[in-house]
UniProtKB/Swiss-Prot annotation:
It is an enzyme of class 2 (transferase). The gene is pduL. Keywords: Acyltransferase, Bacterial microcompartment, Metal-binding, Transferase, Zinc. The keyword rRNA-binding does not apply. GO terms for cellular component: bacterial microcompartment. InterPro entries: PTAC. This is Phosphate propanoyltransferase. CoA binds at V27, S28, N29, K72, R79, F98, N194. GO terms for molecular function: acyltransferase activity, transferring groups other than amino-acyl groups; metal ion binding. It comes from Limosilactobacillus reuteri (strain DSM 20016). It comes from the Bacteria.
Length: 214
């Protein structure tokens, strides 16, 4: 176990002891997941390189970035995420639909049927990917967390966030995503974070106020 994961474990134990309903918040900026095949098309002969580990132990931000090219505009220097995925996927904020000129739906990761396509450009090549979404807010959690909250995969939760400057916000329909290797963390995008005045650091928390909604 490396130092960062040890710190995460210590923070988790302390938090769950003091307030078991608190959930760390991770703010997801726009990013791209690629299959190994699509990565090789964009970065021939290269390997995806780790820039920074993320809270979910298998995931990392890569050194490589790409540009997203839509019918109306371009978003440059969009970070790739590793490891490789079985399907390529682009995640943006809702407001970035207007920049790009597309209409990406709010979906869970991997739910790509009927999603728009977009051109993805690297310094070496350009490809078109079908699979642009606005990620639906969700909570990664271990199986033990799910048992503690009384939820299962796909259940809807409600989380209260005390943003800076008195911007208390209640996020409804937060999807539970339990898995054995997941670490407790709520994911929201930059639009949602801005609305609640939540920072991009690792010190923001939400409080689960309704553990399960039918």
């Amino acid at each position: 176990m490396d130092e960062e994961h040890l710190r995460t474990l210590i923070r988790t134990i302390v938090r769950e002891t003091l307030n078991p309903n608190l959930v760390p918040i991770g703010v997801s900026n726009h990013h791209v997941h690629l299959t190994e095949e699509d990565f090789q098309k964009l970065f021939p002969g290269q390997k995806i390189e780790m820039l920074k580990k993320l809270r979910q132990h298998a995931d990392f931000a890569a050194k490589q970035t790409v540009d997203l090219i839509g019918p109306k505009g371009t978003i440059e220097h969009v970070r790739l995420m590793g490891p490789y995925r079985s399907h390529s996927q682009v995640e943006i904020a809702r407001s970035e639909n207007f920049t790009l000129g597309i209409d990406a739906p709010i979906r869970m990761s991997g739910d790509l049927d009927g999603t728009p396509s977009i051109k993805v450009r690297s310094p070496y090549a350009e490809i078109e990917i079908q699979g642009v979404i606005v990620a639906k807010r969700h909570i990664h959690m271990s199986l033990e967390d799910a048992k503690r909250f009384g939820v299962k995969l796909g259940d809807s939760m409600q989380v209260e966030v005390d943003g800076d400057g008195g911007r208390k916000t209640i996020f409804d329909d937060v999807v539970a995503r339990p898995r054995e290797d997941f670490v407790l963390e709520m994911h929201i995008d930059t639009d949602e974070a801005n609305a609640a005045n939540v920072g991009l650091g690792n010190n923001s928390f939400g409080k689960v106020i309704i553990k399960k909604k039918n």
